[in-house]
Amino acid sequence: MVVDRKHSSKYPEGFAIHPDLVRDKSYVNMYMHHDGYPQWQGVQIANWLLAGNNGCMDGARLSSKLVHDMYYDSCYLYPSADKIDHEYRYVIWSGDKDKIHVSCWNMYKNECVFVLKPEKIISKYHDDMDYTD
């Protein structure tokens, strides 16, 4: 999901809110048929946001670039995130290029795994894997 950061401001949890609360604000709902755990998909998203200054775009532009850059044969777009059966849901909070954050929710456990800037995701979760730059 890509959601403008302003939509989290009315919640005391901020970016840690349950993603279903802002699913109607998401520019894109993308399902990628592979493991979504933070050590893989979290780091992939962080690497992508930092590459080529991708994180500096508004939500609509960021979403279209995300789909373009991350698309592969087992990638699907859905009209709503609640139609996707997945363990981890990531929200990229757009709207301020200097303060971009990503939240990760474990949908099976119904808990927020993290809310971090891309650099912190990499420093916390990077492992010895064959990531895409």
Predicted regions and their residues:
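Intrinsically disordered, low-complexity regions of eukaryotic proteins
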Residues: 6, 15, 37, 75, ...
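Short, extreme N-terminal segment that most often corresponds to the first beta-strand
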Residues: 1-35
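Generic ordered-secondary-structure signal
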Residues: 24-31, 36, 86-90, 102-104
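Intrinsically disordered, low-complexity segments enriched in glycine/proline and serine/threonine
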Residues: 9, 42-44, 90
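Adenosine ribonucleotide-centric catalytic and binding domains
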Residues: 27-51
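Low-complexity intrinsically disordered segments
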Residues: 46-133
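Alpha-helical interaction segments
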Residues: 21, 38, 78-81
